[in-house]
Regions:
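Transmembrane alpha-helices and adjacent helix-loop boundaries
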Residues: 1-225
């Protein structure tokens, strides 16, 4: 006699495993975003340089990362580095590297846009006070830029959480991979397991991403007001 499909969620520690997999997904996303904010802020400042060479290099990096699918980058980092350079790198580390490269490009362009949108007198006032360029950015420019960027940075978290489903293809045991394992082990006894497992994963993604998306919208409205 076949079991009810919904029972697969409560067999053994299946539900706990799914939640632990979700934790891996969120962990990769948050760490990648934090690194992206740091490197992206630096890159955004560099992108405002008057040097044509620097602007060309940063723009090339930005367009290259945007054009290249994240899945291809994951394969290059995880399989390419391991085989060609004998580097032992885990799937989680590969994912963080790739998502940080992607996030840095996205964040860098946002920082560049935020800096160039600031009124020119902000820079002139700092220079008139005798501030060095480092002091000008540290005390005046970056605080304003970060405030403007916070909603976009939070929105980037949701995009990364959803994109992390790709890391299942390099063996990372995140929420989608856990779901596949549970489905495979119950394929014969519970044919409808895939519906309940993937349905649960969908609900979990929504439960995580929706509040983050609303927070981003709320902060953006407050900033505009």
């Amino acid at each position: 006699m076949q079991d009810s499909g919904m029972q697969v969620l409560f067999q053994g520690n299946n539900l706990l495993r799914i939640l632990q997999g979700l934790g891996v997904t969120i962990g990769i996303s948050i760490l990648s975003v934090l690194l992206s904010m740091i490197f992206g802020t630096v890159m955004g400042i560099i992108m405002t340089s008057h040097s044509r060479v620097i602007r060309f290099l940063t723009r090339f990096y930005l367009e290259f990362i945007r054009i290249m699918p994240q899945l291809v980058l994951l394969f290059i980092v995880y399989f390419g580095l391991a085989r060609n350079f004998n580097i032992n790198i885990s799937g989680e580390t590969s994912a963080i590297i790739v998502f940080t490269l992607w996030g840095t490009a996205e964040m860098g362009d946002l920082v560049r846009g935020a800096i160039t949108s600031l009124p020119k007198h902000q820079f002139e006032s700092g220079q008139a006070l005798g501030l060095t360029k480092v002091q000008l950015y540290y005390h005046i420019i970056i605080p304003q830029v970060l405030r403007r960027l916070l909603p976009q940075a939070i929105n980037l978290v949701t995009r990364m959480i959803k994109t992390t489903s790709l890391v299942v293809l390099i063996g990372v045991v995140e929420v989608t991979k856990v779901g596949q394992q549970i489905i495979d082990s119950n394929r014969l006894t519970i044919p409808t397991a895939s519906f309940w497992i993937y349905g649960t994963i969908l609900v979990l993604y929504f439960a995580v991403c929706f509040p983050i998306s609303k927070l981003s919208t709320h902060l953006e409205k407050n900033w505009r007001n």
